[in-house]
Each structure stands twice: as structure tokens, then as C-alpha cells.
């Protein structure tokens, strides 16, 4: 009985592990950022309910991090089709590194957004001039996840370049 698989038998494991890592770690960052900044919004909203909608920005920014992981996971999973073309260890490792780059950057950004969002919305309730500063810090934290997304796209595009087609 022969296998129709061409390439390395273990390579798809690493590719799918990369897709899972991208989604899981990014969603962990998104969940942490949403929860941490959501607690800040809820506690601030008790005293200043008129600021709740203005202070929801960190929660939204944290939620976007999960989408970055989803994008990379879809890119990776569509690139794994061993029956259509050979899938070697280089491809699996490229997809694994792509998923880890995006996922761990999303996790770090989510932690930063959560902490800044929590402290920022509470401080904004006491001193409204701090809103612009909070938004700028949140943008820089979100940029960390964007860097991971960009590197993840570049690394996943490297899969398939280990051989001359």
C-alpha cells in the first residue's frame, strides 16, 4: 500500500501547529486585553457613565488582535495541501514560525492594550486631557501586533521556496 503523499510525512504537523499558534496566542492576547480594559471601563462607568462609549476604544482595539491571528491561520491552512504539491519540512517550519511570530506578537500587544486600557480609562475619568495620550499609547501597542502580522505574512510566503519548481 503506497502513500499518495509527496514530501515529508511530519511537515504538515508543523504547518498546522503554526496555524493553531497564530490563532490561539492572538486570541489569548485579545481576550486578556478585552477583559482587562473592560474591567477598567466597568469600574469607571460606575462614577462617570457618560464616558463609557468614549472609553470603549481599548476593548475594540484588543478585539482586533484575534482577527490578525485568524488571517495568518487561514493563510497557513490554505498553503497546506500535500496532495496538490509537495510539502517539505522547510514549508512546515516556515508556517510554524509564521504562526508563532503573529501569535506571540498578538499576545504581547493584548497584554499591553489591556494594561494601558485599564489604567487609561480610569485616568481619563479623572482627567479628560489624558484621552489623547491613552489613544497614542494604544496605537503603539496595536502596532506590535501589526508587526507580527506583517512578519507572519512574509514568513508564510516563504513556504514552497525550498526547492526549484
From Swiss-Prot:
**Annotated InterPro entries:** ATPase_proteolipid_c-like_dom, ATPase_proteolipid_csu, ATPase_proteolipid_su_C_euk, F/V-ATP_Csub_sf
Name any one GO molecular function: proton-transporting ATPase activity, rotational mechanism
**Organism ancestry:** Eukaryota, Viridiplantae, Streptophyta, Embryophyta, Tracheophyta
Answer whether the UniProt record assigns the keyword Transmembrane to this protein: yes
Report the family membership. Belongs to the V-ATPase proteolipid subunit family.
Return the GO cellular component terms, semicolon-separated: proton-transporting V-type ATPase, V0 domain; vacuolar membrane
Q: Where is this site: Essential for proton translocation?
A: 142
> Its topology with respect to the membrane?
Multi-pass membrane protein
One Pfam family from the record = ATP-synt_C
Q: What's the protein called, per UniProt?
A: V-type proton ATPase 16 kDa proteolipid subunit
Q: Which residues lie on this side of the membrane: Cytoplasmic?
A: 34-55, 118-129
**Is Ion transport among this UniProt entry's keywords?**
yes
Q: What does this protein do?
A: Proton-conducting pore forming subunit of the membrane integral V0 complex of vacuolar ATPase. V-ATPase is responsible for acidifying a variety of intracellular compartments in eukaryotic cells.
